[in-house]
């Protein structure tokens, strides 16, 4: 496993500083070791996860200029941990309501010595919770409150929930083609830029939606 991770990370991230490459490798080794017992990532295929999830996270990183970030429903730490590794001067808060994910994220933070990472066991929809970062991230976020909503209404609900936290100026969503099918009314209600991720590894499309609050 470690050899496959090392070879693929070296291929995909050949232009990154060696220290960041090493941290990504160490993170992924921990991720797949934990995944083998706790199922915390979308695929057991190391090459797929690196070329899809980690690569896309690295592209997302280039869009974020603010100094503090909250990754909502961080799960196994994608994209939040990757953003923290690539941006050591930015404060990255990872929140999730499941103890399995929180325990793993705490281990990663400790073993990789990521001083810019804050891990919180937190329900995003808790009315008493307020985000203290300048931007918020969502990727494959799920919760029973929004499970039966279509994509547009789910997106509206997430944005309106974030807006209750006055410090947040932008919301980023790493998503697929449904973001291209939002109604005219949605675009009248929200200012949003959508950027396609140009991946050399996959023909299927992924997008970064940037919503200005």
Residue ranges and their predicted role:
Residues 1-3:
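Sterile Alpha Motif
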Residues 32, 61, 84, 162-163:
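N-terminal cationic-hydrophobic initiation segments that often serve targeting/anchoring roles
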Residues 91-96:
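Conserved SAM-binding motif I beta-strand of class I
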Residues 97-213:
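S-adenosylmethionine
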Residues 66-75:
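Conserved class I S-adenosyl-L-methionine
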Residues 57, 72, 97-98:
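Generic detector of well-ordered alpha-helical packing
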Residues 5-66, 104-115:
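Class I SAM-dependent transferase core
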Residues 76-88:
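Conserved SAM-binding loop of SAM-dependent methyltransferases across substrates and taxa
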